[in-house]
Amino acid sequence: MAENRYELNKNLAQMLKGGVIMDVQNPEQARIAEAAGAAAVMALERIPADIRAVGGVSRMSDPKMIKEIQGAVSIPVMAKVRIGHFVEAQILEAIEIDYIDESEVLSPADNRFHVDKKEFQVPFVCGAKDLGEALRRIAEGASMIRTKGEPGTGDIVQAVRHMRMMSQEIRRIQNLREDELYVAAKDLQVPVELVQYVHKNGKLPVVNFAAGGIATPADAALMMQLGAEGVFVGSGIFKSGDPIKRASAIVKAVTNYQNPQILAKISEDLGEAMVGINENEIQILMAERGK
């Protein structure tokens, strides 16, 4: 039964392919995201840029606020829990959230263990910066993977690094002989069946999105051309000068990511992008959480 549920969850996540998932803080923003063509919204009280600016401990959002967003839109609603905080996950499941993001954006609740995602009916999204992290999260029951990037910076460089790293490691696994896959599985600390899947199919067993630092239509198209199957946009939309226009442009960029003419047209006159922070100017806080 649990196995059937996991297959169903993976298929649910497949339905988001080619889509944009936007961080929203209230019903009004959620409606803007839905009108712009978002595939889903991520309900959270403080977007990554604010979490980074304020510091301190960041936790799961207020269930009342999440329910207000659920009531405002007809597209799927996601919400974040702290790494390893299975009770926050139980609460989100109780309010019938569509997806749970076990997220490094929030302060980790457990430095060693992630949530046992197989104990839940709801599909989980998890971040990964390389193939090992991705397969370990999938082994725990994640139905969807995203790059970690460095959230709240508006700097795409980390997301690019993570996506390229994932692609390189997948190609390396594909080039191994069958009998070498057992050693690869041991090195990655994952079940050999997952490594065999990557070897045979040249991709992860679940959908792989890009996240962290996506601020422009060009950023979104870049991640798609690098192999992402969709994108998460956090601070990039509602920290910009014209959120409605930018949200719509990023959705169009993901659909038309291989068409420079369309990308040029939709990139015009979007107002100020969010103020970015260069990765060399900050301490990398979030990408290193949860290995």
From Swiss-Prot:
It comes from the Bacteria. Catalyzes the formation of pyridoxal 5'-phosphate from ribose 5-phosphate (RBP), glyceraldehyde 3-phosphate (G3P) and ammonia. The ammonia is provided by the PdxT subunit. Can also use ribulose 5-phosphate and dihydroxyacetone phosphate as substrates, resulting from enzyme-catalyzed isomerization of RBP and G3P, respectively. The gene is pdxS. This is Pyridoxal 5'-phosphate synthase subunit PdxS. The active site is at K80 (schiff-base intermediate with d-ribose 5-phosphate). D-glyceraldehyde 3-phosphate binds at R164. One of its GO terms (biological process) is pyridoxal phosphate biosynthetic process. GO terms for molecular function: pyridoxal 5'-phosphate synthase (glutamine hydrolysing) activity. HAMAP family: PdxS (MF_01824). It is an enzyme of class 4 (lyase). Pathway: Cofactor biosynthesis; pyridoxal 5'-phosphate biosynthesis. In the presence of PdxT, forms a dodecamer of heterodimers. Its EC number is 4.3.3.6. Gene3D superfamilies: Aldolase class I.
